[in-house]
Amino acid sequence: MPEGGDNYLTPADDQMTMIATALGEPETGKQLIAEVDQAFEQAAAAHPGWKGKTFTAATKTADGWGAYVGGSDRVTFMQNLGFTQNPTIAAMQPDATGFSTSLSAENLDSIDADVVVAFPIFVPTAQLTGDPAFAAVPAVQQNRAVIIDGDLAQAYSLGTTTATQYAIGQLVPKLEQAIGS
């Protein structure tokens, strides 16, 4: 993390540039960034119907529910596919993490969007899918929620070039199933 940087808020491209430069391979870093950019561009071009559709990136932890706000690579990932962040979530202030906001079960309906990408963190997926408040969200009721876990959730969250390419390849078909092209 650069001096004065915020934990978990250094953009993926900046991370790759710093790492590649430190390893004496700045051109390799530029190439990897270009490959990710191209993968996003191709996926977005193949799904013009996603442009402007709203999304929420949500998570269930042992502490409860949360949603990612601007500054998170999880938000940027979806924006790179053409989606627009759910304005209700976008207007919320981040908590101490700087990149997410906590949500009570009573306010969980605020995650409703054209598509919801949700994943568990350090809890079984069943705690997410079995939560009655989550099941009551319209996007969930209408099968417009994509639940990810395991390697895909890790890749979606990690933000490295290799992880992002994997996540694009795995998540795009799931988004297609949820909301079409």
Please annotate each region the language model reported.
Residues 1-62, 157-181:
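Extracytoplasmic substrate-binding proteins
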Residues 69-99, 152:
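Alpha-helical, coiled-coil/dimerization segments enriched in small aliphatic residues
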Residues 102-112:
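Short helices/loops that flank or line small-molecule/ion binding pockets
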Residues 111-181:
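Structured C-terminal subdomain patch of bacterial secreted/periplasmic proteins
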Residues 96-104, 130:
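N-terminal post-signal-peptidase region of extra-cytosolic proteins
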